């Protein structure tokens, strides 16, 4: 006897299973089954496809008029941080740039101070609250970065919190050491601080899967970023890079040359960088909510990347300064509107390709897969990025069990 059948599904979203990320035109290929059925046993998918009455189960969910998809994957977050920075909104309204706010002692450095002052247990409670919000919105796989400690003690504290969350909730969660995220005030120079972070790589390896660096004007140069990435690979890390967010320094090209698993942001990436994506499996993780929140007009050139047969994914970039949202559904809407992605491209970018960007087996519904699913209160898959700003996730299913039920009920 099976454990659960989800039946009469209006649309069942079945992203293509592949060893490599979907590239170029492949991103627009999505199998959407009308009147679908999903069968689950022992936390695994037994069947997913067109309607069938050939299976029995102890529990049945009628998903008439609903969409069912793989659980979402958020491939770029800064989940563990102390404090908040709502006071910076007035500075943004005055026209202050991100780098200007950073030079004033705000930005990342403000969060660094708050994170350093927050105990590990309090940091855990805050991050847990934010993670549960993500789960309620349909996310069951997350990447979580450090980068707000900027010293040994506090970088380790962030990574330990991230690992504790993964263990408590048994999530598909990857952890990223982003020690070179900014340069703390106490550092004698960028170069000296970078060497401190490189020296930490062997110690943080037990808590982190990836090593990341912020390659940007006023932070770390292309040459410094390459040095760090090479040292990280020597220490056994797969590497990522925050690249070309503000200035076209060539971070995307560097990521491809160093065979990074992903390059993230890429708002200012050059045509040369986009062309190099053609022969690379590095995933371009685009973060349109960041551009939206910062009030900028120029978004990452997703269409240019796809035209060059690149692989792209979408993520929230959840952080307290430049993307204060942990709702990946909102990112889906912004991507459709501002990056000009089709609904199919959006869905693949938050499922199978996002999973490839953090090297996990998720984002698909195939026989034998973990039964990590979302039942959406929406008539079709196009509706979710169309009707923006609310939570469409009705039920979130982890390992075949309903762990979130957002069904609304009112008392008169």
Curated annotation (Swiss-Prot):
Pfam families xref list: Amidohydro_1
Keywords: Cytoplasm, Histidine metabolism, Hydrolase, Iron, Metal-binding, Zinc
Pathway in which this enzyme or protein is active: Amino-acid degradation; L-histidine degradation into L-glutamate; N-formimidoyl-L-glutamate from L-histidine: step 3/3
CDD domains per the UniProt record, alphabetical: Imidazolone-5PH (cd01296)
GO terms for biological process, alphabetical: L-histidine catabolic process to glutamate and formamide; L-histidine catabolic process to glutamate and formate
Domain of life: Bacteria
Protein residues bound to Fe(3+): 76, 78, 242, 317
Binding site for Zn(2+): 76, 78, 242, 317
Cofactor binding comment, as recorded: Binds 1 zinc or iron ion per subunit.
Binding site for 4-imidazolone-5-propanoate: 85, 148, 181, 245, 322
Database matches in InterPro entries: Amidohydro-rel, HutI, Metal-dep_hydrolase_composite, Metal_Hydrolase
UniProt keyword Zinc, yes or no: yes
The protein's required cofactors: Zn(2+); Fe(3+)
Name this protein carries in UniProt: Imidazolonepropionase
């Amino acid at each position: 006897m099976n454990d659960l059948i989800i039946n009469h599904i209006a649309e069942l979203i079945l992203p293509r299973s592949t060893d490599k990320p979907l590239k170029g035109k492949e991103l627009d290929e999505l199998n959407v089954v009308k009147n679908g059925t999903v069968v689950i046993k022992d936390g695994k998918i037994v069947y997913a496809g067109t309607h069938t009455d050939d299976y029995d189960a102890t529990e049945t969910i009628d998903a008439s008029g609903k969409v069912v998809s793989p659980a979402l994957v958020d491939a770029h977050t800064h989940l563990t941080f102390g404090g908040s920075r709502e006071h910076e909104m007035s500075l943004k309204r005055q026209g202050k740039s991100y780098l200007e706010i950073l030079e004033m002692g705000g930005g990342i450095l403000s969060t660094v101070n708050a994170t350093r002052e927050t105990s590990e247990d309090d940091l855990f409670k805050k991050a847990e609250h934010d993670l549960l919000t993500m789960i309620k919105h349909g996310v069951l796989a997350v990447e979580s970065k450090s980068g707000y400690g900027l010293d040994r003690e506090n970088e380790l504290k962030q990574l330990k919190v991230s690992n504790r969350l993964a263990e408590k909730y048994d999530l598909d969660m990857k952890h990223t050491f982003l020690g070179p995220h900014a340069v703390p005030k106490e550092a004698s120079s960028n170069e000296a601080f970078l060497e401190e972070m490189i020296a930490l790589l062997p110690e943080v390896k037990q808590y982190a899967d990836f090593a990341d660096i912020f390659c940007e004007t006023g932070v770390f140069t292309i040459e410094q970023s390459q040095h760090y990435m090479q040292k990280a690979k020597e220490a056994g890390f797969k590497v990522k890079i925050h690249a070309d967010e503000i200035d076209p320094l060539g971070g995307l090209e560097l990521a491809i040359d160093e065979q990074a698993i992903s390059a993230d942001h890429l708002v200012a990436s050059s045509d040369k960088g986009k062309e190099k994506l053609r022969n690379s499996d590095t995933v371009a993780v685009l973060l349109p909510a960041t551009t939206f929140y910062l009030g900028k007009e120029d978004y990452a050139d997703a269409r240019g990347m796809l035209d060059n047969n690149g692989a792209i994914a979408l993520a929230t970039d959840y952080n307290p300064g430049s993307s204060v949202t942990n709702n990946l559904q909102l990112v889906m809407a912004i991507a459709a509107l501002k990056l000009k992605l089709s609904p199919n491209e959006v869905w693949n970018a938050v499922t199978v390709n996002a999973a490839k960007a953090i090297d996990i087996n998720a984002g698909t519904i195939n026989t034998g897969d973990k039964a990590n699913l979302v039942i959406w209160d929406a008539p079709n898959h196009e509706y979710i990025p169309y009707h923006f700003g609310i939570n469409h996730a009705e039920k979130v299913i982890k390992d075949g069990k309903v762990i979130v039920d957002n069904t609304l009920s009112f008392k008169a």
